């Protein structure tokens, strides 16, 4: 039945770079990103941009869902297939999406020092 949620988030790439360069890098990466995301982003020359875009994507999805209690960062994995980003969900994120009959559409971008993500939630079958 049309659009059911919209989320937008921006993330400072330099902020993520400072975290990656600092003593909190490992705890941050372990808490926020799945192993697959870390493997993909960590081998890129623009790792901070890749991490920032995924951070923004996860924040945007949480906003689109209305910040359901119990959702965890690793419940939301950002993947790419054929160039288009999408979510592979688990845990509370998956439970909420299935209970509400939703599917998510994700757009990512970055320029200069900013990464941004937009998430549109739509009822399945629309």
Curated annotation (Swiss-Prot):
Substrates-to-products reaction catalysed: apo-[ACP] + CoA = holo-[ACP] + adenosine 3',5'-bisphosphate + H(+)
Residues passing through the membrane, by range: none
Record key words, sorted: Cytoplasm, Fatty acid biosynthesis, Fatty acid metabolism, Lipid biosynthesis, Lipid metabolism, Magnesium, Metal-binding, Transferase
Positions annotated to bind Mg(2+): 9, 59
Main enzyme class: transferase
GO biological process: fatty acid biosynthetic process
A GO term from the CC aspect: cytoplasm
Assigned EC number: 2.7.8.7
Matching Pfam families: ACPS
Molecular function terms, GO-annotated: holo-[acyl-carrier-protein] synthase activity; magnesium ion binding
Localization of this protein: Cytoplasm
Cofactors (names): Mg(2+)
Primary location: cytoplasm
Recorded superkingdom: Bacteria
Family in the record: Belongs to the P-Pant transferase superfamily. AcpS family.
Function: Transfers the 4'-phosphopantetheine moiety from coenzyme A to a Ser of acyl-carrier-protein.
Name listed for the protein in its UniProt record: Holo-[acyl-carrier-protein] synthase
Annotated source species: Myxococcus xanthus (strain DK1622)
Gene designation: acpS
